[in-house]
Regions:
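Catalytic domains of cell-wall/extracellular-matrix polysaccharide-remodeling enzymes
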Residues: 47, 69-196
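Active-site beta->alpha N-cap acidic-glycine motif
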Residues: 1-100, 186, 190
Length: 197
């Protein structure tokens, strides 16, 4: 997504928390349909580091999510968050050769979980990352796969039911969930058959 760009009839597929055991299958599906996505990656699963390179090589956007995804660590202070962010930024650069400057905060930029660790941390962090040239992105459509939804049919319904023709359609999904990967082909075909890019 770029400010000022017409977003009508566009669906932005975004995936958090990977790469993981199901990411390669997801990449195969995306490649089959020539669809590009944004991956907000983590650093704690070293078994799938090679997929960072594949994501980049296949034309996807790689954003930074968190190295540890440990709320109790990253949301205690600006310094703790920045250390974690720079760690995942360095890892992405190591595997892709590029320094990503786009991020998605774990829980989103207006999450309430972080208050448990420090009040006002999110407003402080959003200001800090922007001052350093980072851009953060949230979402407008929740697939439900981060919570109790483990049924691919429900994920498809959540996503397709949230899409609007004239709005910004940024879908939050997780490539570490097998049921999300099971749902993605139906989400893509819905979008393509209804004239979305």
């Amino acid at each position: 997504y770029k400010p000022g760009v017409n977003t009508a009839k566009t669906i932005y597929l975004t995936f958090d928390d990977g790469p993981g055991a199901h990411t390669a299958r997801l990449l195969d599906i995306l490649k089959n349909y020539n669809v590009k996505a944004t991956f907000f990656v983590t650093g704690y699963n070293n078994n799938y580091n090679d997929l960072l390179k594949r994501e980049k090589e296949e034309g996807h956007t790689i954003g930074l999510h968190s190295y540890s995804h440990n709320y109790g660590l990253i949301y205690t202070s600006i310094d703790a968050y920045m250390e974690d962010l720079l760690s995942i930024q360095n890892k992405v650069k190591e595997y892709t050769g590029e320094e990503s400057k786009i991020i998605r905060f774990p829980g989103g930029s207006s999450n309430t979980i972080s208050r448990k660790y420090r009040t006002h941390i999110m407003s402080d962090l959003t200001s800090k990352v922007e001052s350093l040239g980072f851009r953060y992105f949230d979402w407008t459509i929740v697939s439900g796969d981060a919570g109790d939804t483990k049924d691919s049919n429900k994920i498809v319904s959540n996503v397709t039911g949230g899409i609007t023709e004239d709005g910004l359609n940024v879908v939050l999904m997780h490539d570490i969930k097998p049921y999300t990967v099971d749902a993605i082909e139906r989400i893509i075909t819905f979008g393509l058959s209804n004239g979305y890019t």
